[in-house]
Design a protein with these regions (language model features):
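Conserved small/polar residues in nucleotide/adenosyl-binding loops
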Residues: 199-206
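A glycine-rich helix N-cap at a beta->alpha junction
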Residues: 169-175
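Conserved small-residue-rich beta-alpha loop and adjacent elements
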Residues: 85, 89-161, 166
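Short active-site oxyanion
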Residues: 192-196
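A structured beta-alpha segment of the ubiquitous adenosine-cofactor-binding alpha/beta core
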Residues: 104, 175-191
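N-terminal Rossmann-like NAD(P)+-binding subdomain of aldehyde/semialdehyde dehydrogenases
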Residues: 1-105
């Protein structure tokens, strides 16, 4: 599928999570954490492939950020479980204005829609971003750096398994197959589909394909 196809598919899944109760969202998140640990071996195999391909092309600091082991995956799962423990502010009234004519105006905290996250080669961002997006009642579109793509794709596959096992729509989290600069541009310019885009890239990555 093209980047735009995946964006549309992700956006179409939004009603399933924006209307979900806090209990339903937390059940999905807990299942995501469990699935991440259950798929540890598959994720580590993909990470080893990414590490082999990246050696000699990125710095030792970046290699360390890319590297995963069981302890790091356990920490990622614990991060998702920590999100479960956070308060759910969806629907919270932030302010109220009462007019003399009886009309009441509320400032209310509501989900935004599709949150796109464009990031470099940090596998832990994949699970952190997905968890926080779902907790807030939004859907998540991820675009990983090319060095971490195999790892990120395996993590997303595990998260989607967890979502499905908890009765959620797996398309509330998706990853773009295209890691080129063009795909990042497409995402940032997808008006009407993307509510918010967050970009965290190394300086040189913004100008390379």
């Amino acid at each position: 599928m093209t980047t735009m196809d995946i964006l549309r598919r992700t956006k179409a899944a939004w009603p399933s999570i924006c209307n979900a109760s806090a209990e339903d969202k937390n059940r999905i998140l807990s299942a995501m954490a469990d699935s991440l640990q259950a798929e540890c071996d598959a994720i580590l195999r993909c990470n080893a492939e990414d590490m082999d391909a990246a050696r000699g092309h990125i710095s030792d600091v970046m290699l360390d950020r890319l590297y995963l082991d069981k302890d790091r995956i356990d920490a990622m799962a614990d991060g998702i479980r920590a999100t479960v423990a956070l308060p759910d502010h969806t629907g919270r009234i932030l302010a109220q204005i009462d007019h003399p004519n009886g009309m009441k105006i509320y400032k209310k905290q509501v989900p935004l829609g599709l949150v796109a996250i464009i990031y470099e080669s940090r596998p832990n961002v994949t699970s952190d971003a997905a968890a926080l997006t779902i907790k807030s009642g939004n859907v998540c579109m991820l675009r990983s750096g090319k060095e971490a793509f195999r790892t990120a794709k395996a993590i997303v596959a595990a998260l989607k398994q967890g979502i499905a096992s908890a009765g959620g729509d797996p398309d509330i989290v998706n990853i773009v197959e295209d890691t080129s600069h063009q795909s990042a541009t497409e995402i940032m310019q997808a008006k009407g589909l993307v509510a918010v885009s967050y970009t965290h890239l190394r300086a040189h990555e913004t100008s390379q394909d």
